[in-house]
Design a protein with these regions (language model features):
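Extracellular glycan-interacting surfaces
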Residues: 3-5, 28-791
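Residue-level detector of intrinsically disordered/flexible regions characterized by low predicted structural confidence
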Residues: 8, 44, 793-802, 843
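N-terminal export and membrane-targeting signals
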Residues: 8-31
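Extracellular interaction modules
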Residues: 24, 769-772, 888-894
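Ser/Thr/Gly/Pro-rich low-complexity, disordered linker/stalk segments of secreted
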Residues: 782-816
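Extracellular low-complexity, O-glycosylation-prone Ser/Thr/Pro/Gly-rich "stalks"
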Residues: 809-919
Length: 919
């Protein structure tokens, strides 16, 4: 993830000052010891059964930088991956998916979702360790920590460190900084950033001591002039590796190699188990050793160097081999015949055939990364692609992205560039130590892999495909869940966003025309949901417009015009019937359009930079909020009037939303610690607000389908309520709340976006900052929503009912059965209404498949329906089951809803269900 993208969602805790860290360090003894703080257990269970919810992700697959992949050296198929802001994962060989391991990280310790290093124990393979912390500057108020697990990451204990760590800082792809002694696995080493040196544990990571005799804490910063900023930190001690042959099992390994971010002194060694250290004589200078890998069979250390720590840059570098027996260094840098200059990273050894090594360019943006392979210890090299008459290239690989088809980034082939790219930011590149044919590597957006790597050596084609299934790493900026067939629309950092027709299926392509690298805000017309607008960061060379508009539910988009002075996306709102758009962009004031973005007029009465939203019922109403003041427009965004309401938060992360089906009903959440912070509701279009007393800290709020028997939408929020931080749902407009997540499912910072599903009661979508779009469903949906098994027992054949029915005709209520129909108008406005129909089976046998018919006595017209397949011809209406709600048990119900585009008129009085009259 880029640093800019991750700063956009403000941290939930006030940022600390740099002086806090210096004061803490001044209190430490020379050989500081860090004890386990309370040995806090953090289980990472697969489900939150006690809350009645199951949790998963909207399927995107990847979406962020994977800087580290680590294979266990003793157990096949035990593999871990680390991300810069989205936690760590373990590979599940049975499902071929990655399992998230750090979802227990919560709101207050959100920085622990950034993983700077991970280590898997080669002796006790159930043990795994993670060094966590996201920023070393004051963006992250908390110190870093070392987490340890004895059950492969299912549960964790945490030891806090007296300094910060930078999982999303420059140099994060170097490593691994954390390493387990392969002979005495109670011993671990950790290379720290920021000048804090080398640290050691002798009790399986429970306590840590600084290795005070280690001579060099590093001195390289990406930009030394950026003091206290993102680029200004000393990248420190960057990797540790062992020669396991230098000791017997149970003894401390004697030969230890350490990489340091110092271009003149980049590799150190101990030959006495860490008692003393020396700079290895004769080593190359002028570059940083990004990676160090030891071949213990032949006694050789390989290093891949670059002129920076990456991951975005690196214009020069070398590859060297060190012979531990003779002390000789040999330059084995592959020579690029095309004259490209780049650093090197992604260094790996084939442990089955240790003469085989591979390295990757760090970094080559155009035309693509280069991968080099040697089968003779670097004496000769071959590369994965080469020019065959410019602009054509000969590729040693083919590329299957069917697992995440959006990875082409909407780009066609533009020789010599091909789409998708082979990779970028590839600092993690690892050959399976048990299988020479298998390789996994990380990029800025995914994990790729191959299972036939050695075909390279015989002139064959290496088959590369997506291997990121289960990793969900996007940073969510906004979410919208329209009623109807489309389940969700996402606005994401780095990869733009998607229209999700099915949340269990990876979308084919991200937003296009215009393509936005990061989409900040998205909205749809509540009564005409096919009309949508989104705003995002323009990408140089693609299109200059920050706004995209669709009238077909996101199937296609066009770039809107921009008012003069626009410099960034801001926020956007679409009115209830899709006839107007209000846009509050960066760089200029609020504007409105009545032409779907082809022209704009400045709004008055509202400050520039205000956050805007639309009323979900009245197409003439828009709302805005800025600096503690609420504004309302009743003329389609032309003019806004300042509300007299006081006591609203003027600072912090403030979000608000209007309630579908309820005109003038607004919920506002946000604020800042040690200041005004909470949740407020208005039922008079913002004229007055009432604070919800139970909400201590409100951060984001959204709405979904009402609970059975209720007419008001379910309310969802990420907040602290009655002293407890979590994800909550209210089925009674905020009178009572139930926490629906648990401590094992917190997903760090969740303050950007939340929404319920308008068609499925209980379903909630949660935006995270690095764990993608989390989706929660009730374990057993009440009433019409049957629970679906995770894996159908017989996917090839439909399940037969206990008593076979005639497939060509749905079963009626039966001779002794009966039914009742409730038809209600649950909301209405000037030119429309919302209806809800409930079918009750009052008979003794189940109804399997239903078709309800009625005739409107007036000129009512239905514009949209949900939970049913509905058609209307003149006044005659036919509503059929939606498939999943086809069976109504005795005493059970099935409900569906619709929006009418006329006045509600007189309600129908006669209904037939499967041809039988129904009361």
């Amino acid at each position: 993830m880029t640093p800019t993208d991750q700063r956009a969602p403000l941290p939930p805790i006030p940022r600390s000052r740099r002086g806090v860290l210096s004061r803490a360090l001044s209190c430490l003894a020379t050989a500081a010891t860090v004890a386990a703080l309370g040995a806090v257990l953090h289980p990472a269970a697969p489900a939150a059964a006690d809350t009645g919810y199951t949790w998963g992700n909207v399927e995107i697959v990847g979406g962020g930088f994977v800087p580290g992949i680590v294979f266990n050296q003793s157990e096949p198929d035990l593999i871990y991956a680390r991300t810069d802001i989205g936690g760590a994962y373990r590979w599940n060989p049975d499902t071929e998916r990655w399992i998230p391991l750090l979802d227990h990280v919560g709101w207050d310790d959100w920085g622990h979702s950034g993983v700077v290093s991970i280590a898997t124990d080669p002796v006790d393979t159930d043990r795994v360790y993670a060094a966590v912390g996201t920023y070393t500057n004051d963006w992250d108020p908390n110190n870093g920590a070392i987490k340890r697990s004895t059950d492969r990451g299912r549960t964790w204990q945490t030891t806090e460190l007296p300094f910060k760590l930078g999982g999303n800082m420059p140099g994060r792809g170097m490593g691994e900084r954390l390493a387990v002694d392969p002979n005495d696995n109670s011993v671990l080493y950790f290379g720290a950033p920021s000048g804090h040196g080398l640290w050691k544990s002798t009790d399986h990571g429970a306590t840590w001591n600084e290795v005070t005799n280690f001579p060099n804490p590093g001195n390289y910063a990406a930009d030394p002039s950026d003091v206290g900023g993102y680029q200004g930190d000393n990248q420190g001690v960057v990797w540790v590796t062992f020669d396991p042959s230098s000791a017997s099992p149970g003894q401390v390994t004697q030969d230890i190699y350490v990489g340091v971010a110092d271009k003149d002194n980049t590799v150190y060694r101990s030959t006495d188990g860490g008692a003393t250290w020396e700079r290895i004589p004769g080593q190359p200078t002028g570059f940083l050793a990004q990676k160090g890998v030891f071949d213990h069979v032949n006694g050789l250390l390989y290093i891949a160097t670059s002129d920076t720590g990456g991951p975005y840059d690196g214009s020069d570098g070398e590859v060297w081999r060190y012979d531990a027996a003779t002390g000789a260094w040999t330059d084995i840098t592959p020579a690029d015949p095309d004259g490209f200059e780049y650093g090197f990273s992604g260094l790996t050894i084939d442990r089955q055939n240790p003469d085989t090594i591979m390295v990757v360019s760090q970094i080559l943006w155009w035309p693509d990364i280069q991968v080099w392979r040697s089968t003779d210890r670097g004496a000769t090299w071959s590369r994965i692609w080469e020019f065959s008459g410019y602009p054509n290239r000969t590729l040693r690989y083919d590329h299957d992205i069917s697992g995440a088809p959006w990875l082409h980034f909407n780009n066609p082939d533009r020789p010599p560039e091909v789409s998708p790219k082979l990779g970028w930011m590839t600092q993690a590149f690892e050959i399976d130590p048990f299988d020479s044919d298998r390789v996994l590597y990380g990029t800025g957006a995914t994990v790729y892999g191959s299972d036939n790597l050695t075909d390279w050596d015989s002139g064959g084609t290496v088959h590369i495909k997506v291997r990121a299934q289960g990793i969900e790493e996007t940073a969510v900026q906004d979410l919208a869940a329209p009623p109807g067939a489309t389940e969700l629309v996402s606005a994401l950092g780095d990869i733009g966003g998607f229209v999700h027709e099915d949340i269990d299926v990876v979308p084919d392509a991200m937003f296009d025309t215009p393509f936005h690298g990061t989409t900040r805000s998205i909205d749809f017309a509540e009564l005409a949901p096919a009309t949508m607008a989104r705003v995002g960061e323009a990408v140089s060379g693609e299109v200059d417009s920050h706004i995209g508009i669709s009238t077909d539910g996101g199937s296609s988009w066009w770039a809107g015009q921009q008012p003069p002075g626009v410099t960034g996306p801001g926020t956007v709102a679409v009115n209830a019937d899709g006839s107007r758009i209000v846009w509050s962009p960066d760089g200029t004031g609020v504007h409105y359009s009545t032409t779907l973005g082809s022209s704009w007029t400045a709004s008055t009465g509202v400050p520039a930079g205000a956050r805007v939203e639309a009323d979900r019922v009245d197409p003439d109403k828009f709302y805005a909020f800025a600096n503690g003041t609420f504004y309302t427009s009743t003329d389609g965004g032309a003019t806004f009037t300042e509300s007299a309401a006081t006591g609203l938060p003027a600072r912090g992360n403030v979000r608000f939303a209007a309630v579908p089906g309820h005109e003038g009903d607004i919920w506002l959440a946000g604020g800042e610690a040690n200041s005004t912070y909470g949740m407020w509701r208005s039922t008079d279009s913002g004229a007055t607000f009432t604070r919800l007393g139970d909400v201590d800290e409100g951060d984001v709020v959204g709405f979904g389908k009402p609970a059975p028997g209720k007419s008001y939408p379910a309310v969802y929020t990420s907040s602290k309520i009655n002293g407890v931080r979590g994800i909550f749902r209210s089925d009674d407009a905020g009178q009572t709340w139930v926490r629906i997540n648990d401590d094992q499912h917190q997903w760090a910072w969740t303050g950007a976006a939340i929404t319920g599903d308008p068609d499925v009661y209980g379903r909630v979508y949660i935006g995270t900052n690095g764990r993608g779009v989390v989706v929660g469903d009730l374990t057993g949906q009440p009433g019409e929503e049957p629970e679906e098994p995770e894996e159908p027992e017989e996917p090839e054949e439909p399940e037969e009912p206990e008593e076979p029915e005639e497939p060509e005709e749905p079963e009626g209520p039966g001779e002794d059965a009966s039914c009742a129909v409730s038809y209600q108008v649950v909301n209405q406005w000037g030119n429309g209404f919302q209806g809800e129909v409930t079918i009750t089976n009052t008979g003794d046998s189940a109804i399997s498949g239903w078709e309800l018919k009625w005739t409107f006595p007036g000129d009512q017209q239905i514009a949209h329906a949900w939970n049913t397949q509905l058609t209307q011809t003149g006044a005659d209406v036919t509503a059929r089951d939606a498939g999943w709600n086809s069976t109504i048990a005795p005493g059970g119900t099935a409900s569906f809803g619709f929006l009418g585009s006329t006045a509600p008129g007189t309600a129908p009085s006669e209904f037939t269900l499967n041809g039988e009259s129904c009361s």
